Design a protein with these regions (language model features):
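N-terminal auxiliary segments of SAM/dcSAM-dependent transferases
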Residues: 1-34
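Conserved alpha-helix/loop element of class I SAM-dependent methyltransferases that forms part
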Residues: 58-80
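Conserved class I S-adenosyl-L-methionine
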Residues: 79-90
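A short SAM/SAH-binding and catalytic strip from SAM-dependent methyltransferases
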Residues: 151-166
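A short glycine-rich, Lys/Arg-flanked "PGG" loop and its adjoining helix->strand segment in the class I
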Residues: 168-179
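Conserved beta-strand signature within the Rossmann-like core of class I S-adenosyl-L-methionine
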Residues: 180-188
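Class I S-adenosyl-L-methionine
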Residues: 209-242
Length: 242
């Protein structure tokens, strides 16, 4: 049993997704934690899973892993042969889903130290290495490790569009994938709308338009529920690098 209780606030007005928060009761003390304060959430063992998987029904790790597996197999290939770079890997829930489907080699990158600590604490057998830092400016040993790997697939789940991972970081990770490699990610549906003006959305539209991403499948689905119980639609994309 976890040593905490987590409550969702009673919200009359709609909070934007990057303003959402929960109330954590731990050791008799209550504190408010924003959903995007990942370091705080990862520091409490089991809080991320309780909050996002249990209470808010987050389905993205399973969705991306399933769609990627389906497309790889449709192409006559095996997920067991993939060497995955999981960008914005968090506490390893995406990597865990990929492992369950037969992926044998995974390396993680996240800018948040607490994310790496949580993955090593809770899912120590998922990643071969877990590097902490900005992938576009990693320490030399981490950069050398990634360069020496035969990365064939990039995954980036629930980490794009709110400033969590900037376009430059996504491009740096994309550059590690060879021709014919796989790219699987998700993004809030409105971020792909031209009217949003999001730099990342503009990058994705550009990469699809100029052929740097050849989309194999694209699916709109419910990423999770909001604190008020509304469905949050996201778009999952599995593509190949030409």
């Amino acid at each position: 049993m976890p040593g905490f209780v987590v409550h969702l606030p009673e919200v009359d007005e709609g909070l934007s997704q990057d303003q959402e928060y929960c109330l954590l009761v731990e050791d008799g003390r209550e504190r408010r934690i924003r959903f995007h304060d990942y370091g705080e959430i990862y520091s409490v063992r089991g809080l991320y899973e309780k909050l996002f998987a249990d209470l808010l029904k987050c389905s993205s790790p399973e969705m991306i892993a399933t769609l990627l597996t389906e497309e790889v197999e449709r192409a006559g290939e095996s997920v067991a042969d993939l060497h995955v770079l999981d960008l914005g890997a968090g506490n390893g829930m995406v990597g865990e889903q990929l492992r369950a489907r037969g992926v044998e080699r995974l390396v993680a990158v996240d800018i948040i130290e607490e994310a790496a600590d949580a993955a090593r604490r809770d899912r120590p057998d998922v990643y071969e290495r877990y590097h902490v830092g900005d992938i576009s400016d990693l320490p030399e040993d981490a950069a050398n490790d990634l360069a020496a790997r035969d990365i064939t697939c990039l995954t980036c789940v629930a980490a794009l569009g709110f400033g969590d991972i900037p376009p430059a970081a996504f491009l740096a990770a994309y550059d590690l994938v060879p021709s014919g490699g796989w790219v699987a990610f998700n993004i809030k549906d409105t971020f792909l709308d031209k009217a949003t003006g999001s730099a990342f959305a503009a990058l994705i539209r550009e990469m699809i338009g100029d052929g740097r991403l050849r989309v194999c499948t694209q699916r709109t689905y419910t990423h999770r529920l909001s604190v008020s119980g509304d469905k949050l639609p996201y778009v999952a994309i599995v593509a190949r690098k030409p």
